[in-house]
Design a protein with these regions (language model features):
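Cleavable N-terminal signal peptides of Sec/SRP-targeted secreted and luminal proteins
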Residues: 6-24
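Midchain, well-structured core segments that form catalytic/ion-binding scaffolds
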Residues: 34-42, 178, 184-346
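Generic non-transmembrane alpha-helical segments
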Residues: 60, 64-67, 71, 94, ...
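A non-catalytic alpha/beta surface segment that caps or lines the substrate-entry region
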Residues: 70-119
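Catalytic-core environment of secreted peptidases
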Residues: 102, 114-147, 152, 274, ...
């Protein structure tokens, strides 16, 4: 995991190593051809071309990660950075500042996806993109998503320091609202970029748990938009030729095995369900156990049944929230609900 600078260095270097050798496999000649096609100059061993002396600024990268973590609505070491809040706006400003320092062309779309572009020698070609997100669920860690954004920017810095000259333009993207924390919609920015019309329509009426609409929340963060603006986020075909994301593992397997890098071949896709239970409410001291129909216990039994199933099947399930309308120790529950998320690669 990239909590240590040397691991972060290897992962940052890997991100662009994969880009420039995407078609190479173990074929050195193919690697050279790929480098030439991507960079726009012949690959040689005579010392000409870009420097092969790549040194990642691990200390600088770690410092940026720590600075970004300070924009949080929860105390360190946790991070809470929810879409369109003041801390989210501060984090966006910080990322754009680094992009500007690197000499990238910076732009934002209508919902706040941020793009830092390093123009290639042939800008008409589809760009190579990399990046991730910086919003954070309540009380999370400081690496999720952030490593993919700051790591990509350090990779750009590294390539610039080494006199690399890209043929295809390179773009670092900071996606808006990867997390579903505020409006219950995950990957909001990237799904709009993918042209999901149903999502664009739904954003006209969606509200958060404080009854603040998406459009009002966006305006509070400086993004005044309407439905037509949402359509402007949709990407044109062939905008990008490739995309790669650097990400922390978020699990214990690689760390436990002492493996510094893993390449994803499949990812568990989520499916979320909300289940409502309705029982018979009553006084906790007066309704005898045989006469009870407790919604909370029914919810607990379902959660345990799902756990048993996924343990046997190899899938994953998480009970995210449990709500009790009574919320009192002197009443047995008449109405309750649970939110579950299941994940699998099948």
């Amino acid at each position: 995991m990239p909590s240590k600078p040397n691991a972060a260095s290897r992962l940052v270097f890997l991100a662009f190593l994969l880009v420039i050798s995407a078609a190479a496999a173990n074929d050195d000649a193919a690697a050279r051809r790929t480098m030439e096609q991507f960079a726009g100059f012949p690959a040689s061993d005579d010392g000409e071309g870009p420097s092969s002396d790549f040194h990642v600024d691990s200390e600088g990268l770690q410092r940026q990660i720590d600075e970004l973590a300070s924009f949080s609505d929860s105390p360190a070491p946790s991070v809470t950075r929810v879409l369109y809040t003041d801390k989210d706006v501060q984090a966006r400003r910080y990322i754009k500042g680094i992009m500007n320092q690197l000499g990238l062309v910076v732009r934002e779309d209508a919902v706040g996806n941020i793009f830092g572009r390093w123009e290639g020698s042939e800008p008409g070609l589809g760009a190579v993109a990399t990046g991730s997100h910086v919003d954070a669920i309540p009380f999370s860690g400081k690496f999720d998503g952030v490593v993919g954004v700051l790591g990509a920017l350090e990779a750009i810095s590294l390539l610039k320091r080494s006199a690399f000259l890209p043929k295809r333009s390179l773009e670092v993207i900071m996606f808006t609202s990867e997390e579903p924390t505020r409006f219950g919609i995950s990957c909001l920015g990237s799904r709009l970029m993918a042209g999901i019309e149903e999502l664009a329509q739904s954003l006209r009426k969606v509200v958060d748990n404080q009854n603040v609409s998406f459009l009002d929340a966006a305006e509070s963060a400086g993004y005044k938009l309407n439905l037509e603006d949402l359509h402007s986020v949709f990407l044109k075909t062939d905008k990008y030729s490739a995309f790669i994301e650097l990400h922390i593992e978020q699990g214990p397997i690689l760390e436990k095995e002492g493996i510094p890098i893993g390449i994803v071949t499949a990812i568990a896709a989520p499916a979320s369900l909300k289940v409502d239970f309705e029982g018979n409410g009553g006084h906790a001291g007066a309704v005898l156990m045989p006469a009870r129909n407790d919604a909370g216990l029914a919810a607990a039994e379902l959660a345990l049944a799902v756990e048993k199933h996924v343990l046997e099947s190899g899938s994953i399930d998480t009970v995210g929230t449990v709500d009790d309308e009574a919320a009192a120790t002197t009443s047995d529950e008449g109405v309750g609900s649970i939110n579950e998320m299941g994940l699998d690669i099948d």
